[in-house]
């Protein structure tokens, strides 16, 4: 149209431009093939405005070459027309080409890339068409502003200044069009191109590119939405990261200060910094409480935009961790390494993790086959022949921890973390199976759901710089997380990308570290209201009616301060969890524990409590009964050791049969018994009853664990359930949190557990869960020999001797009798009623009295010596001690009330784990050697090893003895002092006296107490209420106090409900 002159055309510029009116259009078409292509491509496209003008404009584009007489204006008009046409032709050509490719790649791994590119090209083409059709009238209007005759000017000198300005506006308009088109096209095409390269070229993705993995995509709209969700999450909880008046986060300020100063920080400045951190922590807690029951959701895929997630995490965690988050690499084949160890629900089939007598390959094969069958049910294989294993691998990779753990942790950090002050850690899960991932089929979609629970803790780096004691069990809050990945088989078949996994987060409302009775969710610890709560609860409780009982307990009982059970609650929680590992959701357990039920994790109990409430009620009642029964027994007098038992003690002390002790190392026995208990809910049930009586002490610790354990213990539980091997590393990883993991409870771990009420209770439980596996699995095992020696080999030896005397051989090299002996002594009356009576214990009342007196005297002496000895017992367990050295141990036992409550909790645990395991600890060993305690210890060990819950509670008497009795005994009685067990006075009332060991007779306990004290540091007793719970961590002394709490506990033995899972830590237990 611009080939002809203005006169020739007799048309104004506007009409000519719009019509593309060139008289020589036809000739030009022949000269330029491009317009032909343009017309061909535009036909199907038919954007009316664009097609005609564009085609004609393109044709005219070449016209000035053909025409001998051309002018600058005509050339410019023609050039603009050709340019706009070219944009449309280019877009149509590229769309047409990608469409051709995509039809060829239908079932290959290139199809996804071709389809993505085609979609983007169509979008760009439509945008270009709208842009060019809108710009042409604008250009025409501008050209009409040229001066008269400008179209015929041939020399630039002829153009007026106004003409130059008009042409300048045309130029800028064209530049703008050019820029907008290229920018828009790049924005749309670049991410798809990167995705294509990632899917098709990168070797790891070559074979899975067409499958549209659940997580592989570039900066597509899906990723952009994910980035928005990350930013939104961090902003939603920004009040948790309030900066000081200096604009800096308190924790970061402290860390930077210490890094920048080479000289020691002066005392006064250290004090100021501590005050600042206290203030920041208080503000954080208040802000956390103000968040309410909000549920949060965000997309995963943090590795797809490292810079965005790093920016979003500012203030939520350290800079180094933020950088690592986006660069976190998933192992190329996590399935082969991790899947065998992961219990998983596939459809209606629940497949456990690999067991010690099964090969990982067989386990993997079974899970893969089951997954394949589920997909075949969906008919996903119709027409699919190549790579039909891809969806199986893709889905199963989603349940591997390396795939979801990092994402879940990052999500929790985004919401609840504060750099330098609050860190996110895995909650200890003892019942790994309750948290098993679930893969289900919903139409053509395969849905993978992975529940997990995380805990918010004070940043240990900052706290250690400020020389603050840190309680590993203290948590600021618990967070439930549900990771959901969906693989749409139709999308996969079509080669389209899958949606990114979704992460749903909800803050648990039970924050018990301050001793507050935070309202824990009833049921599984999942919020009862809200979709996430229901889903999470459903997932985590599906394996366990037992588990439910735990949660119910949490809801029923929250008076941590008021009830021993509460104190126990912290310790008990973990213990119970440990015991329930097989059946109960860790969180549920913690909650139950919190609820103050000595949810002795014995599977049977959980099984019994199909309804949380019932379970709780059962636990509570049971505990009371046990306690009462025990008390009754105490009143009557404990069953005294028989001559045979005494002979055993003598043999033990004389070194006779020392070899056996090793064989029957308490660790192993307990482990097995625990495992057995876990495995057989029935056993657990039986144990539970025992536990309840013993639980009197255990309950307290259970609750404690509940409060804190849910966080830390859960991981422990999970490891337990997973497998001994897994358990070991996990235990080590969370050792400071759940040192008392059940399996670890064996001597080495037991000591550590002793510190942690949690741990100890957990340990028994873990032992149960993991106890199935060989001792070697236990993290504590490494220190087993030292533990045995530390314990003086006494504990294990005594266990062996006892088992032999009782006719119960140690279960195995590592099957110490302790763990197994369901020491019902702690259970006292209840155990007596439930379990066969041990003739050896009660046959000679006079002898029993003598032993009791000796035991009491010894304990009193110990109390005097170690009353508050913070770390002695711990000292015996190097792992524990070191782990918790930070805390002031003595403090733990200074609080009489808390102590005694804690003791209950801790004791139960410690009794079961710490005492047994490391009863050899100084006092324990000492008391053991000293006479009645020793006899009692032997006897109890025996019982434990036998796994029967004897009613006799000789060793326990000290625990049960009320402080008064103990004091009285100490003051007025010597050898014959009243057997502690004989004293019915409830320890709880007397226990409070801080000076008196919680259990006069339980000097071993007091040792443990000391340990606990060490643990008690403020951290331990996140709450004063929980201080007892903190004690429970100590677990050695816990036994005695618990009995006081429940009265039944007077015996000081925790019933080892889980067949030794929770062996009462009767004071002398070693």
Swiss-Prot record:
This is Granule associated Rac and RHOG effector protein 1. The keyword Oxidoreductase does not apply. Residues 681-771, 855-992, 1032-1070 are annotated as: Disordered. The keyword ATP-binding does not apply. Acts as an effector of RAC1. Associates with CCR4-NOT complex which is one of the major cellular mRNA deadenylases and is linked to various cellular processes including bulk mRNA degradation, miRNA-mediated repression, translational repression during translational initiation and general transcription regulation. May also play a role in miRNA silencing machinery. It is found in: Cytoplasm, P-body. Interacts with AGO2 and TNRC6A. The modification Phosphoserine is found at residue 723. It comes from Homo sapiens (Human). GO terms for cellular component: cytosol; P-body. Keywords: Cytoplasm, Phosphoprotein. Residues 719-742, 906-924, 951-962, 1046-1058 have a biased composition (Low complexity). GO terms for biological process: Rac protein signal transduction.
